[in-house]
Amino acid sequence: MSQNNFYMVEHVDQVKNEVHLSKYLFNKQVIVKVSEKEAAAYAEFMNGAVEHDSIPFVKYDEERGLICE
């Protein structure tokens, strides 16, 4: 059974196509490889969060190692 958890998006590396996620409660950090298109979308998501003074969170499937939409 897959378990989805909320992780905070720390950083988006568009050069390496990686999304860096953190779960502070459990001191976990994860780097997820994504496509070039997804990296651009997550970078835009981060910019929008900064503009609205919000913290960007995503659902992350720990078992499959994927960010869920």
Swiss-Prot record:
Keyword vocabulary terms for this entry: Plasmid
One protein family per Pfam: DUF5511
Protein origin, superkingdom: Bacteria
Protein name, UniProt field: Uncharacterized protein pXO2-82/BXB0112/GBAA_pXO2_0112
Organism: Bacillus anthracis
